[in-house]
Every structure is written in C-alpha cells, then in structure tokens.
C-alpha cells in the first residue's frame, strides 16, 4: 500500500479546498494510505473529508477562518507559530528583504511573508511517504519542499502567480525541486512559467475536479433567496477580498439603480473586507440593493434561482464558482482577466466585460433585457461543462460502473497525467 500525504494551508470553504476534497475521493483506500495535514490546523470542511483519509494534525479547530471565532483562533495560531523551531529568528533576514521589495512595489502581502514561518513551525512528520502533494501555493508548498520526506513531491498552483504576489525570492526558488507541478488552467501555467521557465518540462494543467451531479442535486434542495424580491437577481459567490473587486461591483450597482433598473445584487461569502464594503454600500444608499449575505453551506439553490451570475475580479486561477454557475446553466458575466478568459467564451457561453463600473452595468443591462441571449449562454455553458467533465474522466480513465477505475486513475496520477 502506497503512502501519500496531502498538505493544504487551511480547510475552509473556498474553491481550492473543495477541489481537494473531490480529488481525495478519487483515491482508493484499498491501494493508498492517505494522510492529510492542514498547516494552520483549521477549517470547517474537515467534516467532509473522506473517512479513510487520516488527519495527522494533533489539534484541529473546525471553524471557518472567516468567522469571528475563527479569526480569533487563527490569530492565536499565527502568533504561537512565530516562536517554535526559531522560525521567526531564522527567517528574519528573509522577512526584511521581501518586505523591502513589497514596499518598493507598494504592495504588501502580509500573508505571503508569513507562510515561510508557518511552514518552518509546523508539525514534525517523521513518516516516509511515496508521494507528498502540496495542494496550495505558499505555506503548503514550502512545507512539502522543506519538511517532508517523500520519494516524489508534487505541488499545485490555483492562482495567477505574479498577480497573487509571489516571487522567486519569496519562494526561495523552491519549484524546480518538485517532481511535478500542476496548474488549474492554461493561463495559470503561462503566468508561472514566465517566472520559472526552467520548469516547463514538468508543469502540467490539472483542472479542478467537481462532482457535477452532486452540485445539481444540491441545487434542488430547499434554500436560496427568501426576501420575496420581484425584480431581477444578480449573484456573486466568493470571499470578500481585494482580488474580487467588490467595490467596483458596488459602484456598478449604483449606476443600475440611478438608471431605474429593477435589480438586486446578492453576494455569498465572507472575508476581511466585509466592514469596508458595508460602509461603501451605506455611503451609496444601497442597503436594499447590494446585499452581503455571508457564507452559505449550500449556495447552489441561489445559483439556480438567480437571473445572472457576475464574477468581476482582478485575476483568477480557475474560478470554481464560475464553473458551478456554468454547470447549473446560469448566464455568466465575467471580467476580462486571467483565468476568467479561459472559462468564458465571449458571445458563446457567456460575456466578458472590463473591470469598470460603467462597462459592468452596461453589460448587465444588455443581458437582463435579452432573455433569448441569456438562455443561449446558459444552455451553451451547461453543455460545455458536461463535455469538459467527460473529457476529464476520459483522461483520468474513470468510467462509472467499473471496479478498476480508481486503480487506473491513481496509476495515471503516478505517471503525472493530468485532468483536462
């Protein structure tokens, strides 16, 4: 039985974490002994981890990192992690150099600075593994590179490398040492290889895995909008972070309201910008028009019930929220940026817009006043996702009803095949 370790930063309800859960389900417990290490000991999705996966954390807090209680716990964890194994002292020069670089660029990413320390102060794993897989950038990647004993080491990238704030100096050029590097989209791959061209021969695209039928099933469960609103509904799903550019969406909603459009915009997600966004909403008098609903355990009824799904972000890797919207046949409008361009074919299965309040509002009006076009985009998007799923299963050699499918999938993964 082969021993495999997966490492992820946290196990919260974001897209990469959900994709990891789906990937874990593809491994046979009869063939693999699977360990999971959550670097920061926290995240609400722990209860969805397959029962045959062994959580190696000595302590674990099953609370969202975005909730009030979760933020408090996360802060304590980070504080206590500064001191073990001399992590802070050992990385002091590293911190100063990278902080200086960030200050020159006027883009300070505190989380990126701290990942090295979080990695160096993590658990000491004495077990030898056949495969160790870092499923996220930053801490998980550093931990697998520096602190795991394994015959083969793989890592995943889920974001546009440079836009997200990573650099060779920040990573200490660790990527060439990995046996295989998987990116979730072609654009993520291209962005990464601009920084690490020497890794071209070992970098493959491995699309996020989604359980399409489970998403459709959950979309039919009770839930969704409960405000009785009779106008058009716009939905966005994602964490409240700078990457998602919600301030631009709020400004677009203001333009729509000023023009008399009968539309309401709903956001599912939590994050550090909640208070700031709430203030902006109040300043523009949009309390009844742009609603921050928080995180939802089952967001899929909202997708099914909305008139338009909008994902106007600064950059993406490959958005699982957009994939889910397409699976459910939503009309999708996304900003013209890395990641989004790869997911939506403008004028075929969705629409692209500039990350500008005026352009967003104009594209929204065009779509909401053209039911025939919306239906076309929704049909084409759902059809495309069905075909993509089939293509991925073919490459992964998984066909329903065959007992050997998991073995084939794992054998392919061992030989570095990718899912497309």
For each feature predicted by the language model, list its residue ranges:
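Short acidic/histidine- and often glycine-rich active-site loop of Leloir-type glycosyltransferases
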Residues: 324, 336-347, 351-352
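Conserved acidic donor-binding segment of nucleotide-sugar-dependent glycosyltransferases
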Residues: 346-347, 351-358, 366-371
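Donor nucleotide-sugar binding/catalytic pocket of nucleotide-sugar-dependent glycosyltransferases
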Residues: 152-158, 162, 176-218
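A short, well-ordered alpha-helix in the C-terminal region of glycosyltransferases
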Residues: 257, 282, 359, 366, ...
